[in-house]
């Protein structure tokens, strides 16, 4: 069956597919000011390296919880020689009609910390979490190309991004766990005289750790089920076999949450001496790993060729986009940076079909106009030059 037909057949019928119809930037990265009207579900940004294509995708990514696709400090997003702050506005067309969403960073005000701001129809919103009722986003960037061969921490961050797109509160819990672990490590380093301080810290660590591990495990389990139902041996984007490894994940899998918390608290207490000597907590979700294998070949992803890894990652991102749609009822906007650069024409054509079949808005960037030639009748193709975007040829 054709990729588009498979995707449509598998998609629940009550989904909404929000699309950006207008994008306004002020003092964001290389853009002093930009007001862009959009009329397609597939948007292609072409231009030379350094022209500002990725900056546009990054601006969109800041409407999701977290630090965006570059994981940059927000102050870095402000235009050099600008006010020190920035503003992003999008007009979204969805099931509720049109809604205007805003995100930005206030300019510096003396010694006060800069505040990140969000708005819905010009009214203040408490956080990016509030925007999740209007849009979801997933992305793939060249910075993810070393995911399978790099350190486990990169795969944990990737997994947490997958969870965050389904559960917008996950990032708050992960940040809370990191703070709780730092607090425990500090108490161990200082040799806390009152053990009740350590017990309180370990209680918080255990509670958050089990919650984080359970959310990761749930997302992986759902993704495994989706991939298993949809996988095809001969797909140009091979299916991934994924598994989550870690001591806390094993506890969560084998017992109720409260029992897992009790057991992990006991492990923390037993390992205080060892952790103090190491200067860090040695057991916890912060040491887990996401194991990925090339399904058709049965090889660990890190053993595959560079091209196979790229295709495997793209297949995983596409599967995750389907999971987000099924879990939230909102087809995510997909951001793909330099996605076509390393794919041959056959695989590019297959990718475009898969993206159309997903049913949501897709943004792609690339330096080579020819890579998107077959999309002339299906996409809005825009030409990016420094600080400016215009209609392509």
Feature names for model-found ranges:
Residues 35, 117, 137, 333-334:
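Hydrophobic "anchor" residues on beta-strands that sit immediately upstream
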Residues 65-154, 160-170, 225-229, 260, ...:
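Nucleotide-state sensing region of NTPase/ATPase domains
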Residues 144-236, 245-248:
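An accessory alpha-helical subdomain
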Residues 2-9, 36-113, 169-170, 192, ...:
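Conserved P-loop NTP-binding catalytic core
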Residues 337-339:
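Walker B catalytic acidic pair
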Residues 90, 361-367:
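Structural recognition of the conserved hydrophobic beta-strand(s) that form the central parallel beta-sheet
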Residues 1-48, 62, 197-333, 342-346, ...:
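Conserved NTPase motor "head" modules and their coupling/switch loops across ABC/AAA+ ATPases, GTPases
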């Amino acid at each position: 069956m054709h990729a588009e037909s498979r995707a449509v057949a598998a998609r629940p019928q009550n989904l909404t597919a929000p699309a950006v119809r207008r994008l306004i930037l002020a003092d964001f990265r290389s853009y002093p000011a930009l007001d862009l009207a959009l009329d397609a579900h597939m948007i292609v940004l072409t231009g030379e390296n350094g022209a500002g294509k990725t900056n546009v995708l990054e601006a969109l990514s800041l409407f999701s919880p977290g630090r965006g696709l570059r994981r940059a400090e927000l102050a870095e997003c402000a235009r050099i020689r600008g006010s020190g702050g920035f503003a992003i506005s999008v007009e979204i067309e969805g099931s509720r009609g049109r809604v205007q969403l805003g995100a930005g960073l206030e300019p510096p005000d003396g010694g006060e910390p800069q505040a990140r701001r969000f708005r819905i129809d010009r009214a203040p919103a408490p956080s990016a979490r509030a925007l999740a009722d209007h849009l979801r986003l997933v992305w793939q960037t060249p910075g993810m190309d070393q995911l399978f061969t790099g350190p486990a921490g990169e795969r944990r961050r990737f997994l947490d991004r997958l969870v965050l797109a389904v559960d917008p509160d996950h990032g708050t819990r992960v940040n809370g766990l990191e703070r709780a672990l730092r607090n425990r490590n500090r108490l161990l380093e200082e040799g806390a005289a009152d053990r009740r301080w350590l017990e309180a810290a370990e209680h918080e660590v255990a509670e958050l750790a089990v919650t984080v591990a359970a959310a990761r495990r749930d997302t992986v389990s759902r993704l495994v089920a989706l991939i298993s139902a949809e996988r095809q041996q001969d797909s140009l984007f091979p299916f991934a076999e994924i598994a989550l490894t870690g001591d806390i994940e094993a506890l969560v899998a084998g017992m109720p949450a409260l029992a897992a918390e009790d057991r992990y608290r006991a492990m923390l207490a037993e390992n205080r001496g060892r952790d103090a000597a190491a200067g860090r907590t040695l057991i916890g979700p912060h040491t887990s790993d996401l194991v990925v294998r090339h399904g058709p070949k049965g090889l660990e992803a890190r053993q595959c060729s560079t091209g196979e890894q790229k295709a495997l990652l793209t297949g995983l991102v596409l599967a995750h986009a389907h999971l987000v749609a099924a879990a939230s009822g909102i087809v995510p906007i997909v951001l793909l940076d330099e996605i076509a650069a390393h794919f041959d024409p056959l695989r590019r054509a297959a990718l475009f079909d898969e993206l159309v079949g997903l049913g949501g808005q897709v943004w792609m960037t690339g330096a080579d106009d020819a890579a998107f030639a077959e999309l002339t009748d299906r996409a809005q193709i825009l030409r990016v030059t420094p600080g400016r975007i215009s209609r392509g040829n």
